[in-house]
Regions:
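Structured, helix-rich domain cores that form ligand/interaction pockets
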Residues: 1-231
């Protein structure tokens, strides 16, 4: 099942309202972390019972706050943002992830990903221990770092074991699609499901069909029109 693994949004609302609403929804408290980045004045962590559940940048030259969450905290964050600001946030980054397991899983997925990359003449990069099949696992990247759409195939179980999670399944493999949308696609993906994120590029749609067995429609921000009151801001 495809799930969100990262969601970053610029929210068109007052920073104090954004922080307060998210803290209430996520059962968290804000902690000031000093100066922000990318022109923002403040950086805050929203901390729940088990740690940081979201982060917020606010103030400075940017009129609207920017917030994001990752990993297991993403779904609750997405629900909160879309529930409070369904028509008033844009997405700057969204990751969709699918998990696999079983004997031979890595080799099968690697073959499919490399085949698609070669067919579409996409850049391939590698990280991890490819020579010795080491315990820390391997990662395959499809697409360049600067591309709006990039995929990662990696041995999640081995990564977690290297991080101290000793009972993580050794054959756990994850395929992720990272999308940094441009122009009107920032609005389109603000309502997309995790599966629909795979429609962000021609090659990612094909990969979804080949690996996930799911046919998805093209994400085309040019077909989206802003409401008059949004365009006027």
């Amino acid at each position: 099942v495809t799930a969100f693994d990262w969601y970053a949004a610029t929210i068109r609302d007052d920073p104090a309202t954004v922080v307060g609403t998210l803290c209430t929804a996520l059962d968290a408290s804000p902690v000031q972390m000093g100066r922000g980045m990318h022109g923002y004045e403040q950086s805050l962590e929203l901390r729940g019972r088990d740690g940081v559940v979201a982060r917020v940048l606010a103030g400075g030259v940017n009129p609207w706050p920017h917030a994001w969450a990752s990993g297991d905290d993403t779904d609750a964050f997405v629900e909160s943002v879309r529930g409070a600001w369904p028509d008033w946030h844009t997405v700057s980054r969204v990751d969709a992830a699918d998990d696999f397991g079983g004997a031979g899983c890595w080799d099968r997925l690697l073959s499919e990903c490399v085949s698609e990359a070669e067919t579409k003449n996409l850049r391939i990069d590698q990280a991890g221990d490819w020579l010795r099949d080491g315990e820390h696992g391997r990662t395959l990247y499809i697409g360049s770092k600067s591309s709006p759409v990039r995929a990662r195939l990696y041995e999640k179980g081995k990564q977690l074991r290297g991080d101290g999670v000793k009972d993580a399944p050794i054959d756990w493999v994850r395929l992720e699609l990272q999308v940094r949308p441009e122009n009107q696609a920032k609005w389109t993906l603000a309502t997309a499901s995790p599966s629909e994120v795979w429609g962000s590029a021609r090659w990612s749609r094909t990969l979804s069909t080949r690996v996930l067995g799911v046919d998805v429609d093209k994400v085309d921000g040019r077909l989206w029109h802003e409401p008059d009151d949004v365009r006027a801001l």
